[in-house]
């Protein structure tokens, strides 16, 4: 697909009425980010005049939306910064770090990053096989652990947790850098003992981890280091995965979490961001039905919770009409 950054101040011509493509960066194909991006595209297309290939009434341009699988939060933000993507799904913590130039974004601040809306809660979870007998972070010592692929939100958050715990990769027997779509198979095949992942629940891949021969479950992440993470950052909060969310999960899993957010750039046109935001708001019940993780969404929370970058003017315009 051709990726286009739109500038609606240019003269309207017949050429401008052809379909123009934009991209929403998501995450692994089994994760909720992938579902989020494609749900947004679906709402945009639902709001459009289908015969005009995505043209909204009163708009001279026709927009077509794609939401491919990607490496996740930091990758998406980087692609937006480089002008390759127009939107992306990203954890609230990495939105904060990118716009403020902190953590992995130190020296590479993305001051033009803009927020569109937040979506579901994302507890950071460490899943461990039953055989490994891992019950808490301390018992990860000497185990084979997937810390996530470089550029992903899960990798970034895992490293933040490790830093809070005062450990590095040498704490484990070995580490892997598998993607979110690869790690469940590795756990089920006995190639790793555990993995860390930020994801909304319920999630099909996590259910697979719970029901395969690994008989995996999420462990508790509690104690002073975790509380320090929560207290030290507005984008973190205590989170609980209720017992029974997954097969064989007999107890609540207490952890910390972030919000999934949709971000863009100040360079993306007001009208495009407006149309995307309005499509979700106008079809809100349908959007919520696209995944169980969206079931508890409220419009009033989506415009403030987990957002540290300034709201894009196009999103503000849509919210005023919602």
Regions found by a protein language model. Name each.
Residues 1-10:
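Bacterial N-terminal signal peptides
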Residues 17-91:
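N-terminal (or domain-start) structured segment
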Residues 19, 60-62, 72-75, 82, ...:
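Extracytoplasmic
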Residues 21-53, 122-189, 285, 305, ...:
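Bilobed "Venus flytrap"/periplasmic-binding protein-like clamshell domains
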Residues 85-120, 200-204:
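Acidic, polar ligand-binding/catalytic clefts
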Residues 92-94, 102-104, 130-132, 168-263, ...:
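Pocket-lining segment of extracytoplasmic ligand-binding domains
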Residues 143-160, 235-304:
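Ligand-binding clefts/hinges and TM-proximal coupling segments of bilobed small-molecule sensing domains
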Residues 182, 199-213, 218-220, 259, ...:
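An extracytoplasmic/periplasmic, membrane-proximal ligand-sensing/linker region
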């Amino acid at each position: 697909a051709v990726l286009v950054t739109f500038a609606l101040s240019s003269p309207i011509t017949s050429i401008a009425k052809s379909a123009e493509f934009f991209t929403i960066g998501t995450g692994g194909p089994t994760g909720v980010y992938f579902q989020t991006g494609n749900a947004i595209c679906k709402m945009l297309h639902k709001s459009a005049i289908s015969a005009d290939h995505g043209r909204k009434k009163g708009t001279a341009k026709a927009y077509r939306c794609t939401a491919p699988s990607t490496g996740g939060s930091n990758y998406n933000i980087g692609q937006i910064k480089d002008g390759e993507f127009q939107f992306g799904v990203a954890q609230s913590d990495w939105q904060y770090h990118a716009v403020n130039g902190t953590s992995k974004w130190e020296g590479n601040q993305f001051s033009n990053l803009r927020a569109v809306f937040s979506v579901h809660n994302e507890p950071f979870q460490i899943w461990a096989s039953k055989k490994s007998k891992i019950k808490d972070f301390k018992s990860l010592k000497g185990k084979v652990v997937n810390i996530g692929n470089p550029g992903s939100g899960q990798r970034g958050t895992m490293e933040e947790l490790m830093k809070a715990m005062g450990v590095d990769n040498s704490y484990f027997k070995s580490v892997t850098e598998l993607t979110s779509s690869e790690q469940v198979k590795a756990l089920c095949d006995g190639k790793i003992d555990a993995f860390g992942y930020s994801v909304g629940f319920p999630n099909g891949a996590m259910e697979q981890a719970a029901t395969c021969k690994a008989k995996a479950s999420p462990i508790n992440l509690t104690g002073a280091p975790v509380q320090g993470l929560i207290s030290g950052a507005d984008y973190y909060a205590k989170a609980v995965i209720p017992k029974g969310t997954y097969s064989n999960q007999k107890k609540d899993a207490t952890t910390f979490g972030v919000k999934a957010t949709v971000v863009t750039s100040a360079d993306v046109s007001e009208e495009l961001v407006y149309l995307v935001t309005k499509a979700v708001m106008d079809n809100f019940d349908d959007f919520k039905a696209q995944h169980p993780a969206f079931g508890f969404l409220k419009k009033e929370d989506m415009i403030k919770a987990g957002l540290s970058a300034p709201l894009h003017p196009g999103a503000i315009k849509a919210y005023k009409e919602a």
